[in-house]
Amino acid sequence: PVQYFLGKDNTSPVKVEVDAPQQHPDAVGTWRSITYTYEDGCQIVLWGGDYGDPNTPYISGPNGNVYKNFVCDIPDWEKKLSDYPEPEPQVTDFIECVKTRQPFALNERNGFRSATIVNTGAVALRLNRTLHFDPVKLEFINDEAANRLLDQPMRAPWNI
């Protein structure tokens, strides 16, 4: 949903920053924060467990912030929101989508980009460093170790 709200279903963050203790090589554990930054400066900040200031914005962008319960510090945000057209209705009945060949609201495109957010964060946590990501090439920039974690070899006898 965050990608949709931000109008970013067709892209991914260009930078992932982590603040976390060193992770076990085979599993990701706890973190203090993960910050995803998009090309336009918009950020998504995830706080882990009991860390973080409860007053930190959920979404922070160049024009303001959105906090818990959709509290905003964006000037005249309610008027700005009312100026936007209603979004196109989305079909949420999967069976109906199969029958009519309409795209499902939660489709492969936005599902892929949502999974990419999770995966890039997991890679940054495992390596415990800031990573830069190319959302078009779908690879980390100048970081072979990070790219190897995006496409890990499967255990035998499995393959694709």
Can you name each region flagged by the protein language model?
Residues 1-41:
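Rossmann-like dinucleotide-binding domain that binds NAD(P)(H)
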Residues 1-10, 31-33, 52-160:
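C-terminal helical cap and adjacent loop that interface with cofactors, partners, or active-site loops
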Residues 22-26, 49-50, 83-86:
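Short Gly/Pro-enriched turn/cap motifs at secondary-structure boundaries
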Residues 39-43, 63-64:
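Glycine-centered tight beta-turn/hairpin loop motif at sheet-sheet or coil-to-beta transitions
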